[in-house]
């Protein structure tokens, strides 16, 4: 609808390439009429200063006070995670009161996988001269230093979160509204979704600018789980004529949301918009120089001015993607963040990710169909074909079904049923993202963020999500649990897929090799052993060996490259496993030297049985991408390849 972005409703309500056109009307959040007789708390701002192992916590309380209401005091109580209390009482002067806490042994807040997430309870009471409480405020505070490092380095200008002095490799996904009818979203639903993120080893999440500012409980849960929040302001894929009335409206919007959210430990940065700098720079969407000037005013003057006044310790980024603003090459691979879509929209192969050393990838993705049970929720049996009217209406990206089938033709034999097509599409999605994330983690330091588009759906639909509308994990979410693991072993293989753009070409002179890498995203050195084997389809071993592994904290190490060019292309595969010093399995995987559709798989003779809470699966041969269908909506502890071994799935 023309002008819909000026309504300050979620842009995606008016249709997106994963969501329906279902705009709402009216006020959808609670409205309160507050009255007071003497004074009330108008605003509270908490500032942190970290120095030499201590933290100074300054609480500034601004009061709204009737002229003749007398003297008021503010009592601030800080309760540590262990229950210890500190109290400071301050008398207001000219409508302001300040309380300061100095913590000599602070418990610091860390992102998921880097440490704990201790939260301090800060309680503020406004008391009159008789000690009667007139107003109150209660929040959870995490103690941390958090910014974005943009230091110059050998690759250009880095872009990474730095938390308590530690540079973090961001791993996560982009969050869109959880329901097209946003009043249906509940704290329990959001908690389940975000817990699924933490369970898959996410440490970050991007709130995309085409939706809405989530409720307080969203950020409370992120604080508890250690999920760093990249927070877009709510502008996406549009331009504006900046009138005085619109400027006044959006400025009030900025102030309201910054004040509401700034105390959260998980809030990592504010970002001006989604993809608008990039497309305005390309001359798209804009119809006049005035609109281009208004863009600069909105995102490089108005928002920074609000943040300087309301949240001066926050990091602001003008757009995503961006290299720093002012239309200066927003997709520069040597600085800032990028959205990379040549895999999928550009139809380039998965291996193309390996050609790029971005600094921070805030969007890249691949579509798949939702789980079969989800498809059954909106189709009759006669509709269960991806080109049926109903199925096409649940695919909002017009050319996407064709793209899925294009990539399918490169990798797999044509599925014999819709259920197998769903399975194959989810494997394609998961493996595409695996190529990208594993590559960028192998180049930690140059790249410091891999954020997948997208996390979730707002209705039952074919999309880029890793969790569908009903909360069912697609294959991608299981893969994310593996390739976002704190310690990751991965393999850069060379074979047909990496050397031939046409997988049907004869592979004369083909290089076949395996190059293992171990990425350690923990705060401790990792020591262990990498075991490898070259195997036949029945899982029998042709060659095997091992490498001793030592990986410093927060780094990635390459192991020696191995050449297998003299072995068969279609009947050998390479498997690998990482063990710690105690012999415990840390990670594993396998690679082929050809497209899976051409590999000469043997019957693995799969067998599965249930024992207590475990599903035990055995295989006598190589079984790749085994899916367990439990007959109920359950999340399994693992889904994996089998090499002729026992696998336990809880």
Model-derived segments and their meaning:
Residues 19-26, 39, 270, 305-308, ...:
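Substrate-binding clefts and catalytic carboxylate motifs of secreted carbohydrate-active enzymes
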Residues 162-163, 260-264, 310, 352-355, ...:
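Extracellular/periplasmic catalytic domains that process cell-envelope and extracellular macromolecules
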Residues 224-227, 235-236, 456, 533-536, ...:
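Active/binding-pocket-proximal capping segment
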Residues 7-8, 34-39, 43-45, 133-238, ...:
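Active-site-adjacent substrate/metal-binding segments within catalytic domains
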